[in-house]
Amino acid sequence: MKHYEVEILDAKTREKLCFLDKVEPHATIAEIKNLFTKTHPQWYPARQSLRLDPKGKSLKDEDVLQKLPVGTTATLYFRDLGAQISWVTVFLTEYAGPLFIYLLFYFRVPFIYGHKYDFTSSRHTVVHLACICHSFHYIKRLLETLFVHRFSHGTMPLRNIFKNCTYYWGFAAWMAYYINHPLYTPPTYGAQQVKLALAIFVICQLGNFSIHMALRDLRPAGSKTRKIPYPTKNPFTWLFLLVSCPNYTYEVGSWIGFAIMTQCLPVALFSLVGFTQMTIWAKGKHRSYLKEFRDYPPLRMPIIPFLL
């Protein structure tokens, strides 16, 4: 059985960083990364991007050496992705923050609204209902991160945790300040508006959870398998008939419901920014589905049925 020789060059300087002799033909890129780490321990596998061309796409960890368009002496180019952190850690951090930050404003801890309001309670029912909904949303997200989601990528750049936390924590503080303010004004149409908004919120939260469970069942634990998601017997998953990412559709719907319930401008802005970002993600995933699966359902749109 022939063996391969693998040289790894710096993608920027073309400097030879490592030479691997007698590499098995069936070795994966993940195994080559581990061998590279032995000579350069500062670059652990998650930091490494190996590619066939200095400006090309990163090879997948599961790619097999003998199936790549290389000879028995293969040249790979290395790029440092920077310090990495696990997706689970990032999600837990960015979701735990809003949960606790919101509660600080809800309980009106000292130095927020003035001494005479310390630890007082709002007289408006919608304020307490909003706290329950907000807390439920982020507790749900935390539990899904721990027990439901299966991540195709193990890590992301460390800098992302600061960007994500600034976004989630900042908006949580902004909306919580106004919703729990002693001078907060309840919704214009009173109980009817709150009940309608609560119904929207609850339905969308159930829908979002149902989609996450359906997506989880598509991917076996520990794998990166991708399949076309289809509706199940659960009615909340029937939205798969019309959109590629109904989890985002339901998520946006939840925040629209919360915005109607609280009639709070920061919540509306958070919903708008979230919708914009999720639309970008949904379009990317939709394109990926179309590219990977020739039999992908043609009627589906990325996030909004028939429109977007």
Curated annotation (Swiss-Prot):
The keyword Nucleus does not apply. It catalyses: a very-long-chain 2,3-saturated fatty acyl-CoA + NADP(+) = a very-long-chain (2E)-enoyl-CoA + NADPH + H(+); octadecanoyl-CoA + NADP(+) = (2E)-octadecenoyl-CoA + NADPH + H(+); (2E,7Z,10Z,13Z,16Z)-docosapentaenoyl-CoA + NADPH + H(+) = (7Z,10Z,13Z,16Z)-docosatetraenoyl-CoA + NADP(+); (2E,7Z,10Z,13Z,16Z,19Z)-docosahexaenoyl-CoA + NADPH + H(+) = (7Z,10Z,13Z,16Z,19Z)-docosapentaenoyl-CoA + NADP(+). One of its GO terms (cellular component) is nucleus. Expressed in most tissues tested. Highly expressed in skeletal muscle. It is a multi-pass membrane protein. PROSITE patterns: S5A_REDUCTASE (PS50244). InterPro entries: 3-oxo-5_a-steroid_4-DH_C (IPR001104), SRD5A/TECR (IPR039357), TECR-like_N (IPR049127), Ubiquitin-like_domsf (IPR029071). Glycosylated. Pfam families: Steroid_dh, TECR_N. Pathway: Lipid metabolism; fatty acid biosynthesis; Lipid metabolism; sphingolipid metabolism. SUPFAM superfamilies: Ubiquitin-like. Belongs to the steroid 5-alpha reductase family. Interacts with ELOVL1 and LASS2. Interacts with HACD1 and HACD2 (via the third lumenal loop), but not with HACD3 and HACD4. Interacts with ELOVL1, ELOVL2, ELOVL3, ELOVL5 and ELOVL7 in the presence of acyl-CoA; interaction with HACD1/2 and that with ELOVLs are mutually exclusive. This is Very-long-chain enoyl-CoA reductase.
